[in-house]
Amino acid sequence: MKNFLVHDENTRAEMLESIGLKGIEDLFKQIPQTARMGELNLEKPLSEMDLQKRIKQIAKENKTDYVSFIGGGIYNKFVPAAISQVANRFEFLTAYTPYQAEVAQGTLQIMYEFQTMMCRLTGMDIANATVYDGATACAEAILMAVRIAKKNKVLVSKKLNPEYLQVIKTYTWANGIEVEYFDEVPENTADYAAVLVQIPDYYGEITEFKAVDCLSIICCDISTLSILKTPAEMGADIVAADIQTLGMPMNFGGPHAGILACKEKYMRQLPGRLAGRTVDADGNQAFTLTIQTREQHIKREKATSNICSNQALMGLWATLYLSLMGEDGFRQAGHLSAKNAHLLSEKLAKKGVKTLNKNFFNEFVIEVEDADEFLNRLKANNILGGIKLDDHRVLVATTEMNSAEEIDRYVATLAEF
C-alpha cells in the first residue's frame, strides 16, 4: 500500500535537496504571481437535483438563435446525427494508442480507411492518421521539408491564416529555421527547402502559383477539395490540411484535427501515426501501426514527431462524415457552400457593398465604411456577420447551413444601414 500513498514531508525534502532546491515554491518561481491560479471561487455543494436546475439556469444565458457568417478557419457545417452515436461508443472514445494490434483491429481499420480517404481527397500517395489541426499540420510540414531538403530556409505566404502563422513562428523559432514571408513567390527559390501557400488563402482568394525549384507545400481546408483540383494536381509535394469541416462541430475552437499527406518517397519523414494493412499468421487481413521508427520509439531528437494519438478520434469523426455523406453528398455540400457565398456577394453588390475577391470558394472579403458599425448592426439582428480585418474590411463566409432566407436577412439588414 505504501507505493500508493502521497509523498510525506521527509520524502519531499529529500527530493528537493537532490535537485538543489529549498522548497516547493522554488519549483514555480519562474511563473509570475499574476499568472498563477489563486483559490477557486466555487459555489457551495449542491445535491444532484439542485445542480441540474443550476446548470439549466446557466444554460439559458446561451445565445443559440444567431445566424453565423463567420469563417476564418472554423466553419458551421452540417453534422449528421449518427456521427456522435458511433464516435462516442466506448470502443472508440479513448486516447489509447493501438499498439496492441490484436485487440485494436477496429480502431486500426478506421485509421487505415481514414488515411485512404485523405489520399483520395488530396491525390497524394500517403496520409497520416491526423495531427492536431491545420496550424500544426503547416508547422510540421515545414519541419518535414527541412529534413528532406537539408536546407534551413523556407518561404511562407503572408496570406496564410494568421493563427497558422503564429504556430509556424513558434515551431521554426524553436528549431532555428529561417522563415521569409512573401506576397508574391520570388523568382529564385532554389536556395529554400520549401514554399508554403494556402489555397484558398485566409482571405478566401483562390490564386494560381507558378512552379518552384524547391518542395511545394499546399495548405487547404479539406472541404474545398469537393470542388477544386486536388493538391497533387496543383503540384504539391506535401499537403497540410485542416479537416474540421468533415463533420466536427465548432466546439468553441476544438478539438479538431489536421492531416499531412505527401509523395511516397517522403514517407519516412512524415510525422504522426500510420496504420498499415497486412495479413496475420493465418493469412487473414490485419491492420497494424507501421513504419514506427519515425516516431518516439527511437531517440526523441531523431524522431519525426512526438504527436499524441487522441486526435485519431477526430479522424474517426471525419471518416464517419465522409461515409455517411458519400462522394455525392460531400460534393453537394461544397457546391451549396460556394453557391451561397456567390449569391450573398452578388446581392451585397446590388446594395453597393464591394467584394474584393476575384476567385473564391465560400469565403470572401467585403469593403465597408465602418466595419464595427457594420457588424454591430448585423449582430443586433442576431446575425454574426463576419470577421473584422480592419476598419473597412470584413471577412464573410457561408456554408451549406446558410439558407436563402438567412442570406436575404443579411442583405435586408444592411439596407437599413
Kindly label every feature range from the protein language model.
Residues 15, 106, 136-284, 348-351, ...:
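Conserved PLP-enzyme active-site core in the AAT-like
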Residues 35-112, 298:
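N-terminal entrance/gating region of PLP-dependent enzymes' catalytic architecture
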Residues 401-402, 410:
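Noncatalytic alpha-helical scaffolds and linker/capping helices
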Residues 38-41, 53-56, 76-77, 333, ...:
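Flexible, glycine-rich loop/tail regions that form catalytic "lids" or insertion modules at the edges
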Residues 100-103, 119-139:
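Short loop-beta-helix segment that forms the pyridoxal 5′-phosphate
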Residues 90-101, 119-124, 149-150, 170-174, ...:
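Gly-rich Lys/Arg/Thr-decorated short loops/hinges at beta-loop-alpha junctions or inter-strand turns
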Residues 1-37:
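Compact, charge-rich alpha-helical regulatory domains located at protein termini
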Residues 246-351, 356-358:
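Active-site C-terminal subdomain of aminotransferase-like
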